[in-house]
């Protein structure tokens, strides 16, 4: 199997697992961030902020249907599979968000309105409309702070092993932005 075939197969598996988790109404993840290959010895540190389209049950799918949650607004399809393959080939640590960017976009600071967007492309996100300061703070505490802490820890650990890492973020893009 070629690396691109391997990545495509993993992407299909990820999407199926995410859909099954929503259908079963059970959490797929118990933490908003995962560090893979933490002791990787290469010069890179990989980051995948939009690795998952998982919406924890307490957010009620943010009022969206499965088609919206499978689309690019919820995650970067295929990015985690590519990041995993890169981590393997480069012997690099990988820090990946395990919650949809619609719950909290870990590529945005807490004060950014786009950290929890009320609209994305052609979609309105009902579960993000009119969030109170307290609700925004709760999501920041639940998702962003653990992600940033894991990223900081990974950077520091890499620095202690071999010096500052070259940080590479992994994303995917949709062929047509609506």
Where on the chain are the PLM-derived regions?
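N-terminal catalytic or cofactor-binding beta/alpha core of small enzyme domains
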Residues: 2-6, 13-167, 172-178
């Amino acid at each position: 199997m070629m690396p691109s075939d391997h990545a495509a197969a993993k992407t299909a598996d990820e999407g199926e697992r995410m859909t099954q988790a929503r259908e079963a109404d059970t959490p797929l993840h118990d933490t908003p961030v995962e560090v893979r290959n933490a002791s990787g010895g290469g010069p890179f540190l990989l980051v995948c902020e939009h690795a998952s389209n998982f919406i924890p049950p307490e957010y009620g799918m943010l009022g969206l249907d499965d088609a919206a949650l499978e689309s690019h607004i919820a995650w970067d399809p295929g990015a985690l599979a590519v990041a995993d393959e890169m981590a393997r080939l480069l012997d690099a640590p990988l820090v990946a968000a395990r919650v949809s960017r619609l719950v909290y976009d870990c590529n945005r600071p807490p004060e950014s309105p786009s950290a929890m967007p009320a609209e994305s492309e052609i979609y309105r996100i009902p579960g993000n409309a009119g969030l109170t300061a307290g609700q925004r703070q709760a999501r920041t505490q639940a998702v962003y702070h653990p992600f940033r802490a894991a990223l900081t820890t990974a950077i520091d650990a890499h620095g202690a092993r071999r010096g500052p890492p070259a940080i590479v973020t992994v994303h995917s893009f949709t062929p047509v932005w609506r």
